[in-house]
Amino acid sequence: MLIALLIILAYVIGSIPSGLIVGKLAKGIDIREHGSGNLGATNAFRTLGVKAGSVVIAADILKGTLAAALPYLLHVPIHPLLAGVAAVIGHVFPVFAKFKGGKAVATSGGVLLFYAPLLFVTMVAVFFVFLFLTKFVSLSSMLTGIYTIIYCLFVKDPYLLVVVTLLTAFVIYRHRANIKRIINKTEPKIKWF
């Protein structure tokens, strides 16, 4: 029973629509009606600006970190990655935002920040290298996911490998419209990096 309650709590934490809340507070807008219509950090940066976008990405990362920490904080015998995955599902399908959320990148990163901090640090570095080279946030996110799988092949943690592989597949699936735009050369590039 405690495990089920913890999973529900992790999902609810993930469901907190950071982009929607920050958009309303910072600019008085619903970011789902602007830019890509997505609740995630990339649309927040594009729609709300760097300061508000930074708050959204920090909040989305924190959701994953907090959810992964719940088993330790509440002394519930469940793997932290499972709790983290529940938060990622909440972020993508948030009960508080009609089940239309972000693309799982920042919240997945937050899970890894708690469970595998070295992986998280290298992921951030790899992401910015890809971003510098490609100027596409979406492509950089997907390539960083593939990097995490390769990293996990060298770490003796089968749970981490399975979860990272599933999360990367999910991130790529959530970016399928971006993939089409990249192929059609209509995906917007960032201009500030």
Swiss-Prot record:
The transmembrane residues are: 2-22, 76-96, 112-132, 152-172
**Swiss-Prot/TrEMBL GO biological process terms:** phospholipid biosynthetic process
Name any GO cellular component annotation. Answer: plasma membrane
Task: Tell me where it mainly resides.
Answer: membrane
Please give the pathway this protein is involved in: Lipid metabolism; phospholipid metabolism
- What enzyme class is recorded for this protein? transferase
* Catalysed reaction equations from the record: an acyl phosphate + sn-glycerol 3-phosphate = a 1-acyl-sn-glycero-3-phosphate + phosphate
Q: Does the keyword Lipid metabolism apply?
A: yes
User: Per UniProt, which keywords does this protein have?
Assistant: Cell membrane, Lipid biosynthesis, Lipid metabolism, Membrane, Phospholipid biosynthesis, Phospholipid metabolism, Transferase, Transmembrane, Transmembrane helix
The keyword Lipid metabolism appears for this protein = yes
Which E.C. number(s) belong to this protein? 2.3.1.275
Disulfide pairings: none
Note the topology in the membrane: Multi-pass membrane protein
The GO molecular function terms of this record are:
acyl-phosphate glycerol-3-phosphate acyltransferase activity
A Pfam family hit: G3P_acyltransf
> What's the subunit arrangement here?
Probably interacts with PlsX.
Described by its record, this protein's role is as follows: Catalyzes the transfer of an acyl group from acyl-phosphate (acyl-PO(4)) to glycerol-3-phosphate (G3P) to form lysophosphatidic acid (LPA). This enzyme utilizes acyl-phosphate as fatty acyl donor, but not acyl-CoA or acyl-ACP.
Family statement: Belongs to the PlsY family.
- What's this protein's name? Glycerol-3-phosphate acyltransferase
Originating species:
Bacillus velezensis (strain DSM 23117 / BGSC 10A6 / LMG 26770 / FZB42) (Bacillus amyloliquefaciens subsp. plantarum)
Q: Which gene encodes it?
A: plsY
